[in-house]
Regions:
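A short, active-site helix/loop in glycosyltransferases that binds the activated sugar's phosphate group
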Residues: 130-156, 163-167
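A conserved mid-protein helix/loop that constitutes part of the nucleotide-sugar donor-binding site
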Residues: 7-15, 188-211, 229-236
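Aromatic "clamp/platform" in nucleotide-sugar-dependent glycosyltransferases that forms part
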Residues: 252, 271
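Conserved acidic donor-binding segment of nucleotide-sugar-dependent glycosyltransferases
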Residues: 49, 303-316, 324-330
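Short hydrophobic beta-strand element within catalytic cores of glycosyltransferases
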Residues: 288-292
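N-terminal strand-loop element at the rim of the active site
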Residues: 1-56, 145-147, 157, 229
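Membrane-proximal helix-turn-helix segments that form the acceptor-binding/catalytic region
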Residues: 63, 116-135
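Short His-centered aromatic/hydrophobic patch
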Residues: 76-84, 102-105
Length: 362
């Protein structure tokens, strides 16, 4: 992986690695660089930093590492790390099963880059992804996208992202330093969690919150846990929309439990997702969810509004209306928790183990 920072894909790898380690697998996580603000991991898992800031510069250290160590499986997460892992494995002259886990809709992920860069991404996928042993897609939307990009259907398998129910759910309900912003507040407590990137479309959320305030006369505090390149532009929008008393950017938050527990609603305003891990986390706390019906993930997780409120993408009026309706008509926490259990690592992990055993026996 690139690193083990506080992101959805990184969280998935931490959970999966922990599960495999408990199944007596010898697990190492190779990262380009080690960050201080990273996922907590099982002490039996080896973290091997390549101490490189660029993917291309990581090729030779990675190839050298793979030559010195025999791995049964090399699992690459997300382009371009997938390509790096495949190339280093092939040229290490060691025989390993190369498994990719693709977490995003690649056709959308790089659409803000230059046309030339987008062509390079798509060409590399069409030419190289079919050389992998297998590609795990975290949603049907990711699978469909890779098919369109030229990956053979036989190479693709959908396994939804896992959560670790036993480690993530506890009985604590106190307010921490972040959720203190809600303590004694009587309005709507809205939570969003995710990196501050373009695809999360927080401007859509801010516009919806303005409608919620001006049209529906609601008082609320919206806490956003996450960091990223759009932080300064989002701060400017908060001021422009006069939302300083309503929206708080918390930055990266290591432990979001208190935030989830004390929220009234969880809101996702994205233009697209690969899966939407935060939606599953919100289900685990029995929180009513409002999410844009973007590709892909929200509908696969929430169904046709059985487990959350879905609204059209980039439509502030509809998003505001859904937030208002969801607050007045919250879903049963018991039903949401039951859906959450469908993503337990004890179920999802078995699918990974079964696949790996099949690949090893071929």
């Amino acid at each position: 992986m690139n690193n083990l920072e506080l992101g959805g894909a990184e969280r998935v790898i931490a959970i999966l690695s922990d599960y495999l380690a408990h199944q007596n697998c010898d697990v190492s996580i190779i990262v380009l660089n080690r960050l201080h603000n990273q996922q907590a991991l099982n002490s039996n898992i080896k973290i091997i930093p390549l101490n490189q800031n660029k993917v291309l510069r990581s090729f030779f250290p990675l190839r050298s590492l793979l030559r010195k160590n025999k791995y049964d499986f090399i699992i690459g997460n997300m382009w371009p790390i997938t390509i790096l892992g495949l190339a280093a494995s092939l040229l290490s002259l060691r025989k390993s099963n190369v498994l990719f886990i693709e977490h995003s809709i690649i056709s959308n992920e790089y659409n803000h880059q230059s046309v030339a860069f987008q062509r390079i991404v798509k060409l590399s996928i069409r030419l190289l992804y079919n050389f992998s042993s297998q590609i795990i897609c975290v949603s049907n939307g990711v699978k469909n996208d890779l098919e369109k990009l030229g990956v053979k259907k036989s190479k693709l398998k959908v396994i939804l992202n896992p959560v670790d129910i036993h480690s993530e759910l506890s009985d604590h309900d106190e307010y921490d330093q972040h959720s203190l912003n809600w303590k004694d507040f009587t309005g709507i407590k809205i939570l969003s969690v995710g990196n501050l990137r373009i695809n999360k479309n927080y401007p859509n959320l801010f516009k919806a919150l303005r409608v919620l305030r001006d049209k529906y006369n609601q008082n609320f505090i919206s806490l956003i846990a996450g960091d990223g390149p759009e932080k300064e532009s989002l701060r400017a929008l908060i001021t422009e929309y006069s939302l300083e008393d309503h929206v708080i950017l918390l930055g990266g938050v290591q432990d979001t439990e208190s935030l989830y527990r004390n929220a009234d609603l969880f809101v996702l305003s994205s233009d697209y997702e690969g899966f939407g891990m935060v939606l599953v986390e919100a289900l685990g706390y029995g929180k009513t969810i409002v999410a844009t019906d973007c590709e892909s993930g929200p509908r696969e997780i929430l169904g046709n509004s059985e487990h959350g409120y879905l609204c059209s993408v980039d439509n502030p009026e509809r998003l505001a209306e859904s937030i208002y309706k969801a607050y007045l008509n919250k879903l049963s926490p018991d039903i949401l928790l039951q859906r959450y259990k469908d993503f337990d690592i004890s179920l999802i992990g078995k699918k990974y183990l079964s696949l790996m055993q099949e690949m090893k026996s071929d």
